[in-house]
């Protein structure tokens, strides 16, 4: 005890200057410091206290209680005081160097943590306030002291005080005399012990100390407390008596709740004296067994409310005094403190007892640190029996080392709470925690992960804890890949709250979270999305493209909820970054690389899942774009987004708007029928009865009556039309939901849907309607989902009519034009300037114009009020004029032009038909026809005929002008031929005077001779307007291409087809054949000339008179055109030929035999094959759908054979067998087998298709070639086809069976034997066994696998790039697999689209490489930029959309 006192005196002397708090017990550390002060106190072995303290210091001792409370309850103030470091573990720390808020345990929820924090803060504030008030109260008490209004005690009686306080006195007198004694002792100065010997004996008498009357015991305690004050620093009693005295003191301290209000002043003064002189510092010395029970009793009486605040403060002071005096902290005391520390109310909120204990330990944290280290060793030590098995004692609550078993179970909670108090508390346990993190038991790993996640999430200590043991932090981060989902969830919660000043550590955590984007559990993937969003919004510069890649990929997740969260999260992130850094153009390169692709990613999802489409629209409309009332800003942001969209995503966005348009049209048609079923349901147009004969009028009336008698059938048609455009909803059929919508009970919702479908409804009104409808569809029924889908699909959200005003303003601003003056229309011809027209736009075509063009193709009616503004742009550069003409051509039906503006527009369009650009001239002519037809024609009121004399005169003048330019040898040949071709196609009569001139020009001067006419070299348009070919042509080739197109239009538009017309067609074929011998043109020019001729002939063959006259050789030439390959990969001209062929066939303008041309494209690149498969599938499905709706008698008719897709197989086999390389392909026939396999794959889907093709092959084996009767090539090809058919479909186990088609081989191509007219199935099987013409040891070459039912091509051999693409996809999917500790953790969360809440058969997934090709159509090599401008013009004119080619009328 002496050594301990010496150390204490020395340390107090060191810290006295800093704290200004004198201590009663001073410890000695070294001998030199003993001589520094005469006030050093030592405790002798016999327990006496020595002191030289002056009486002047008594006031300081009395203030110590108040100062102590202020230090404990106001740690923020004590932090400002400089303190010296204390190295002696037993030395108590009067003040705390760091102040930390009370934190709940690891088991509390975030809301509970918040409540706990607030409760702790409120308690601290209350205690701080109370501390100051208690200080002032104590000062007053010190000055006045307690007076009992009694006569002073007679001092002489002290000598015989034992007799004076004899047991014969009544309780009232005893109390009265004790009060007098207390008052006397209060006035007695410290150290004046004269006459108190007998008093001491009396006070320790059991009749007073153990009296049943509380007031007697209280007054005895008051007197004893004053005795201790007077005798300080010596002890007035020996150890035996002290036990009795301390028993009385502890009993009185714990009776605070029972003290009467009248006695509270005496009670509080007693506690104050005990606190000031720190009597309870002797408790451990007097009786250590009383220590833990006293702590337990005090802690159990803590209330934590305002009413009991003084007592809570007193308990805190007493317990602090005891802790400061301890040489070592017993295990039982740690048990009690820690049990109180982790005590929680229901819901996990810390109790007032836990908060009190937290503050108690925090105040003495530095002193308790070493003692806790020793306790921690026992706490973490596992209990082992002699046999090596874990001890399990059910009969005892304590373990071998005295630690509570409950504490051992909650060691992780203890570690976290102690870490909150002082991080150094848990440093000795870090190694054990690292072992626990790698334990086999998942619950142990989870417990360690929880406590460390809480610790590392502490902002003030995370960096220090990481640096303390880096290996522990690395092991902890590895738990992101734990097998147990609960542990991975804990780690995700940690990453959400993790904060650090180190960017490196933050990046490590983000990478770990990124790996969880491919977690097997959707909830963890959702959590990873939320965490990324939080970090990005907080600091976007933390991101890099590598981290963002998986984040963006979540919009393609297989789980619908994950996709939904990803779409909303990405939209929120993009908006946050834009609000912080401004428009995308102002972003840094890093931000652009990371976040500019977000709109692209969202738009790309429009092509994946049906249930995501309207969510993407909501994300755009409500998050990416500003508020609906700010239309100007919405327009600017939309332009900004559209600028950074890839070309493929722009097309996807356009396609989605077209889907919305289709649904809106069908929905409004249904509504119109409901309003007026007689007009709409009858589907008849009113006609004049005077112009119809009586019989026809009667028939029409009967038809209308029949239709009106069946309104239900009519409405079913409209419902079906709407249903065809809806996805599938879970629980109900979409058709039933449409019927439910049109019931009277849903009339309000229906009216709102009609209103939101109106193009004039503003964005704000649309938003209000959406809110109104969605508020009525809060449940999760199918009808609610259907209503939500409809309200978003029918609305003109994202972009609509309101945007046009600001888009046109922005376009005028970009072009530097003056503001539009509606009251002062301009004369376009006067404003037109050729220099301005020929001048290219400096920065290319503005994105504003591109958006306007896209909108005109989808919503042509939104331009109705802006016609005068649009035509004003026709005086700008040719790069601007071309898209403006497209807009006018798309929206001409809805534009409202004044008469003066219309006349000026027609004059301007005629002027543009003579510009040097053929594409622009042709578009100007077609636009002129659209505007001029209603303006220059009228209906005669007398006979009802159309009077188009004005239009004919105008067109004749145009034709005369064009031929005059030819005579004058104008350098505008290409445009003149283009416009003449348009005139010849639709209005051949206006060229009647110039037919001979045209024949001479086309046949004699251009096609078969040398043309002396020339054209201007500067004819190209801006590259962003036209997708021209990246080729180089000679001038003669360019002229011939223009002539071929003009000739095809001329032949198509002729009223009467004569022998001369057929000769012109044959001349084109001869020119086609002669190209192979031509030495003037290079290989590319020859190939492209052939393709142009094929396109022209396909256009001509729409007239059946031409098509019927072609020979088998000519048919072969047409089909072989699709097999032409050039050095250009994916030649756009080949694609255009395929698209032209598909167009005329789907419109049934060419017979099915031309399907053979699709099969001859088998050797083309993969992108071309995909296009072929797409168009051929569309044609075949259309034909089969028509056949399925025909009556059985009609479908079996012989004249319908040519309508079946399978009827093209004989023609295709003929083309394959007459290839020049067919015989050279022997004996393996690899190329021939490739062609046959590809075409068979296109046609065969089911068993009946298989049987039809099988029958055709067997019949062909018995036929003879009509051209070369000795040739057996077609039989060899048929045998190849049979082997392919058997090999590729052997898993289907199909066999030849009866089919609904009569096989008729074309007589021009094959000679048919009479015995084949009625061949049975047995005959077909027999014909297979005929002697084969294939080599004896022939083996079928390796062939690509067939496509599946979803039309997904599994071709592995068609193109080498396909294998590369699949390998890259596999590498990308498996990129992060090796980072995980478990096998089931990473299971391809990005899957092929499947059905979700709203589901339909998924769209075909495009490979990454193919998507990349679609996204970069503008990339061109610099080596070929020097091509002639005229070449670009001709090729671009060929690529323009030919929707107007359907106008074949005269």
UniProtKB/Swiss-Prot annotation:
Biased composition annotated in UniProt, kind: Basic residues: 1402-1427
GO annotation, biological process: cell division; DNA repair; mitotic sister chromatid cohesion; negative regulation of DNA replication
Biased composition (Low complexity): 77-138, 692-707, 1350-1363, 1387-1401
Record field: compositional bias (Acidic residues): 45-59, 1430-1450
Keyword Oxidoreductase: no
Record key words, sorted: Cell cycle, Cell division, Coiled coil, Mitosis, Nucleus
Biased composition (Polar residues): 682-691
GO CC terms: chromatin; nucleus
Family: Belongs to the PDS5 family.
Function statement: May regulate sister chromatid cohesion during mitosis and couple it to DNA replication.
Protein name: Sister chromatid cohesion protein PDS5 homolog
Source organism per UniProt: Dictyostelium discoideum
Gene field: pds5
